[in-house]
Amino acid sequence: MAAITAGMVAELRGKTDAPMMECKKALTEADGDMAKAEEILRVKLGNKASKAAVRIAAEGIVAVSISADGKLGSIIEVNSETDFVAKNDEFIALSNGCAALVANQNPADVAALSALPMGEGTVESTRSALVGKIGENMTIRRFVRFEAKGKLVSYIHGGAKVGVVVDLVGGDEQLGKDLAMHIAASKPKSLDSTGVPAELLETERRVAIEKAREAGKPEAMLEKIAEGTVQKYLKDVTLLGQVFVKAADGKQTIEQLLKEKGASVAGFTLYMVGEGIEKKVDDFAAEVAAQAAAAAAKK
């Protein structure tokens, strides 16, 4: 059997855009024959993986995995091109499986996660096979693993488009759920003011000064006005400063709620699917027609 070198794998990948592991398998099956390996990939993937890999994946789901004792957990975002595929059972199973691997195996990054065993292959080969089967690109975008100081509580909202994990010290399960729901609704940027970048605060300060100046406020008052604006901004974007969404009086902040319950938040992570990804907007009718055509082609 011919030796399969990294250069051969790279060459085949360059010709087909197929995943590295699939290229290596094809070359092995073809005993090193490049043309035959290319044909094997064409038959196996129908060129779907290659074509799909260049398209933007801005839909998808957020998945979480938390241990029974609430001490270990993870949150992960896996993207697809359309919401239709994001609801596919195999896509959901892939996402949940990846979340469990992150929690249990602690991979350093997406590349390390992709190399972990899954089923009869790896995460990457499983993902690639699903891309070939469905004909739509899907990518593991990001994840966070948690080792709780307290107990982890999660919340998934809107068809898994928003996910939250909270590390709650003290309190009970209901408090954790309430906090996670609040975070999903109010979208704080950080736990407290120490987590807000200084440059962001400086931008808010400059904008406030310019607005006050344009409004004709005295120069001597500009700094005081800016400081008030910054403090209001901090209340709006920090979890502890925000008004609790379920506050009976409409005034109780999260910080006050936690003090009342004798609890604290060690940290949290909020994921929103596609956040920061430039999404291509297609005509809805055209998208439905494309999905129907793809389904018909598989019959």
From Swiss-Prot:
NCBIfam families associated with the record: tsf
Physiological role: Associates with the EF-Tu.GDP complex and induces the exchange of GDP to GTP. It remains bound to the aminoacyl-tRNA.EF-Tu.GTP complex up to the GTP hydrolysis stage on the ribosome.
GO cellular component: cytoplasm
PANTHER family xrefs: ELONGATION FACTOR TS, ELONGATION FACTOR TS, MITOCHONDRIAL
Keywords: Cytoplasm, Elongation factor, Protein biosynthesis
HAMAP family the UniProt entry points to: EF_Ts
Annotated InterPro entries: EF-Ts_dimer_sf, Transl_elong_EFTs/EF1B, Transl_elong_EFTs/EF1B_dimer, Transl_elong_Ts_CS, UBA-like_sf
Region Involved in Mg(2+) ion dislocation from EF-Tu, residue ranges: 82-85
Family of this protein: Belongs to the EF-Ts family.
Pfam families: EF_TS (PF00889)
GO molecular function: translation elongation factor activity
Name of this chain's protein: Elongation factor Ts
Record's subcellular location: Cytoplasm
